[in-house]
Amino acid sequence: MVEMKFAVRPERETPSPPAPPAGYDEPKLFEYPTLVLLLVSVPLFLLTAYGFGWLLWQIQGPEVFATLFAVTETGDSTVLVLDMIDVGLPFVVALFVTVAVHELLHGAVMRYYGQDVTYGVNLAMGAFYAAAFGQFQRREQLFPIGLAPLVSIAIGATPLLAVPVPSIAVTAYMVLVINTTGAVGDLYVVWCLRRMPEGTLMYDVDLRHMYVFEPLDVEV
């Protein structure tokens, strides 16, 4: 008789949060609804692309899009051909610069509040990040931390739509679309924070595990 043994790889345990501070309830795991956020990001992208595209059209006129499309007239028809080289390079630049600046702005506000910031890239998740691991963050601080990139980049990039250099204006348009769409997770956190009591604390154990500590003396 041949005895066969199979080694079962143990499941990865969820990292434990610290003990609750005095006056706080037991921690609750905070999770992002990944599928919901992905679905929400689609109409957000379309709305943002149309909105900023309309603004760019109003400021620059239709000729600005000549940097994106090659126009060919054949008989009674006009054919628009997307130039992938002229579009692809500004898009890649806009993507990486926007993501990097987005996270640097998160980190800058964290540092303003005296938190130690860790920057990094998680290839498995396909994400850049700025995080204050192993530190309590107050609910009131997380509002500016979460909204700083969305607001700052919008303020900085929107005026560039009026620059009379099509490549700059179009790149600014891409930055605005990428940044706004990519802020869907930040907007979700802010929406959740609005429903939490004042004084709530959040604690990042690692990139995937965030815990919420709510105060015990909450008035109903």
Locate each region found by the language model.
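Short pre-active-site segment immediately N-terminal to the catalytic Zn-binding motif
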Residues: V81-A100
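Active-site recognition of the HExxH zinc-binding catalytic motif
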Residues: T98-Q115, P149
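Metalloprotease/metallohydrolase-associated module, dominated by Zn2+-dependent proteases
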Residues: V2-Q60, M125-V220
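Short juxtamembrane and helix-loop transition motifs at transmembrane-helix boundaries
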Residues: V81-M84, H106-G114, A131-R139
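Perimembrane loop-to-helix junctions flanking transmembrane segments
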Residues: P62-D83
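Membrane-water interface of transmembrane alpha-helices
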Residues: A108-V121, W191-R194
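Generic, low-specificity signal for short hydrophobic/alpha-helical stretches with a mild N-terminal bias
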Residues: T74, V79, D86-V87, Y129, ...
